[in-house]
Amino acid sequence: MRVKVIDADAFSYIFRTLEEFIDEITLDFTSDGLKIRGIDPSRVTFIDILIPAGYFEEYNVEKEEKVGVKLEDFTDVLKTVTKNDSLYLETDENQNIKVTLDGVYERTFTFPSIVASEIETPNLNLEFPFKAKALTVTFTDIIDEIEDIGGDSITFKAEGGKLYLSANSDMGSSTIELSTENGGLLESEGGDAESVYGLEYVVNTSKMRKPSDTVEIAFGSQIPLKLRYNLPQGGYADFYIAPRAE
């Protein structure tokens, strides 16, 4: 297996985001692309990612290969990527994964494959009463603003085709309206709904602003929030965040 990433910096931010939730992952290289699944230790957030073969400049995968890595070590290397670096991933005969950064000079790092914990896929057959789409930078900037207010929860409320995000803390409260009319949303559909989620989990997805241009937001009353950060060539990073009992 050997692949070459087109935008190494953007690629690194997918893993920087994952590191906010989990400690180890299995990289599943298939004919369709690189698949990654994970669930955080508190079992609040389930993650499902597809980085399609077309996302890569080169994608040489003859058969499915799974490689487990410790995210901290793997991400520390990816954080050293510079704008002009080419990034290669490949496996050797022992299923170790080699990361090569080729820029002004070549740097190579080899990580032993680990046996990552098996992921039990939750039931994701969900019907979402409200769905919307926004620019990723718009959504994540708003989430960052709400984080500044403090508090540990965020309320998602859909009413009249508009999306309201709000939070409360000792510092005060904040409510932000997003709609197609004010440009906060690119599109929206569905009925009214309201649910509360842990603010930390939503904030931890915000690094996806780097590799993703648009985000799809779907939720309903007392069901998980789904954030789909769209990636080039039909890829996606899905985050399912369980609601809080309020």
UniProtKB/Swiss-Prot annotation:
Q: Which InterPro entries match?
A: DNA_clamp_sf (IPR046938), Pr_cel_nuc_antig (IPR000730), Pr_cel_nuc_antig_C (IPR022649), Pr_cel_nuc_antig_CS (IPR022659), Pr_cel_nuc_antig_N (IPR022648)
Origin, by domain of life?
Archaea
Q: Name one GO molecular function term.
A: DNA binding
The Gene Ontology biological process terms listed for this entry are:
leading strand elongation; regulation of DNA replication
Alphabetical keyword list: DNA replication, DNA-binding
Q: What does this protein do?
A: Sliding clamp subunit that acts as a moving platform for DNA processing. Responsible for tethering the catalytic subunit of DNA polymerase and other proteins to DNA during high-speed replication. Both trimeric complexes inhibit DNA ligase and both 3'-5' and 5'-3' activity of Hel308 (Hjm) helicase, but stimulate Hjc, the Holliday junction cleavage enzyme.
Subunit structure, interactors included: The subunits circularize to form a toroid; DNA passes through its center. Replication factor C (RFC) is required to load the toroid on the DNA. Forms dimeric complexes with PCNA1 and PCNA2, and trimeric complexes with PCNA123 and PCNA323; does not form homotrimers. Crystal structures show a heterotetramer of 2 PCNA2 and 2 PCNA3, which would be large enough to clamp a Holliday junction.
Q: What family is this protein classified in?
A: Belongs to the PCNA family.
Extract the HAMAP family matched here. DNApol_clamp_arch (MF_00317)
NCBIfam families assigned: PRK01115.1-3
Q: This chain belongs to which protein, by name?
A: DNA polymerase sliding clamp 3
